[in-house]
Amino acid sequence: MSYNRRSKNITQGVARSPNRSMYYALGYQKEDFDKPMIGIANGHSTITPCNAGLQRLSDAAVAAVKDAGANPQIFGTPTISDGMSMGTEGMKYSLVSREVIADCIETCVQGQWMDGVVVVGGCDKNMPGGMIALARINVPGIYVYGGTIRPGHWKGHDLTIVSSFEAVGEFTAGRMSQEDFEGVEKNACPTTGSCGGMYTANTMSSSFEALGMSLLYSSTMANPDQEKADSAAESARVLVEAVKKDLKPRDIITKQSIENAVSVIMATGGSTNAVLHYLAIAHAAEIDWSIEDFERIRKRVPVICDLKPSGQYVATDLHAAGGIPQVMKLLLDAGLLHGGCMTITGRTLAEELKDVPSVPRADQKVIHPIDQALYKEGHLAILKGNLAEDGAVAKITGLKNPVITGPARVFDDEQSALAAILDDRIRAGDVVVLRYLGPQGGPGMPEMLAPTSAIIGKGLGESVGLITDGRFSGGTWGMVVGHVAPEAFVGGTIALVQEGDSITIDAHKLLLQLNVDDAELARRRAAWKQPAPRYTRGVLAKYAALARPANQGAVTG
């Protein structure tokens, strides 16, 4: 039986003789035209350590595809480094790159009539970009995550990239020596791999195991380890079998499997960015999903993993403790996962987890039993109020002061806010407002890790609030609220805030409120004028023109 269901459109018949001529130039033989064509979407790049170790994984996938009797076709996908672009204009390209990656994969797979695709990625937007593409084109596919970085070490402390960001605030506050500042800088990132806490890359890759689109245990492996390359090869073999079975992404990505993915995100204390990305993935798969669904799941799924940024441990510790399968087994036994969901292996999630212990190992402290959860409810909350009629996203667990009412300190760009924090112009009790940074206004919803880390480094993490229509890094923690919708650029209430206005952030009531009377707000709204777009040409201008609101995933189509 032939499994080249799609690629035969480009390789078979008299009219395709010129096509075959070009394939012969690539080393193909006549018998190869009856084999399935498998794309390898290779995200390798020396831009960032997150992607610098992907070539080895792509090579392993290529070899496995050949061994499985199929033809590998390698093409590149772009990336930017969120960590390196953070705090600069370059960060505006981060979320945009999610759309570019999705479009890139769609273009290559559809343009070349590939029968399946192995997506290999590392940095934050690689994961949602790849999954959006798979859900959109609905061609058999699997996600191979590049793997996590190992933790750095300095004077007995484990480090991640967030340690470096927070060191900036500590050093400028005089709370860290020059020696320690440089020590953290040089030792925070000791290997290739994605940022090591339960930040955005590890959040999304972990959730892909629960979604059914990645192999078990693959999300918490360290990039340099041999098991990571072995997992990439096994992923490619599984994908070829999925092509033979005609098992497609939309057979796997369903509303129930997305609920599984979000449940794992809640249980592991994952990134706020997951809210945005799963809205986008669901949209690509044509599944009815909203921010209210996140709140519904938050109320029933506890946080059971003690992971950075708000906890103690990193992804390699989670891997040693049993990985995401151990987390999922606890959730499944508690009735918090849909075990009947199909996975890329052709087996259900419950079947995949059959041999995973029902009790986590006693010699580890990363994964807690359900009845000993760190928090009884999830951490990613949807806040609403007159400052966010369409919703905003916050991490609410672990806050010593879950309610703050204070004067607004208003900034229309990130650099001005960062300078004010580092110059000690932000004081305990203030609420920093960063606006005109939404999908259209930023454009691209840049992440605010630099100012939030500076606040923490200054020792103000529990006493200063920050709200924005932009995003936060997965490494952010504290009294911070992002994804405010409607955004300032379209006239959302956040655009009407004035310096010194009273703002309340209430994590208990899930409230984000500007304490200004309706008549005054109406006066300000009548006087407000939409600013000119920051960009009128290029990819940022294209994105700004097409982007939907944050509460719809900030998608472009």
UniProtKB/Swiss-Prot annotation:
InterPro entries: DHAD_IlvD/Edd, Dihydro-acid_dehy_C, DihydroxyA_deHydtase, DiOHA_6PGluconate_deHydtase_CS, ILV_EDD_C, ILV_EDD_N, IlvD/EDD_N. Binds 1 [2Fe-2S] cluster per subunit. This cluster acts as a Lewis acid cofactor. The active site is at residue 473. It comes from the Bacteria. It catalyses: (2R)-2,3-dihydroxy-3-methylbutanoate = 3-methyl-2-oxobutanoate + H2O; (2R,3R)-2,3-dihydroxy-3-methylpentanoate = (S)-3-methyl-2-oxopentanoate + H2O. One of its GO terms (biological process) is L-valine biosynthetic process. Keywords: 2Fe-2S, Amino-acid biosynthesis, Branched-chain amino acid biosynthesis, Iron, Iron-sulfur, Lyase, Magnesium, Metal-binding. Pfam families: ILV_EDD_C (PF24877), ILVD_EDD_N (PF00920). Its cofactor is [2Fe-2S] cluster; Mg(2+). [2Fe-2S] cluster binds at residues 50, 123, 195. Mg(2+) binds at residues 82, 124-125, 447. Homodimer. This is Dihydroxy-acid dehydratase. It comes from Burkholderia pseudomallei (strain 1106a). The gene is ilvD.
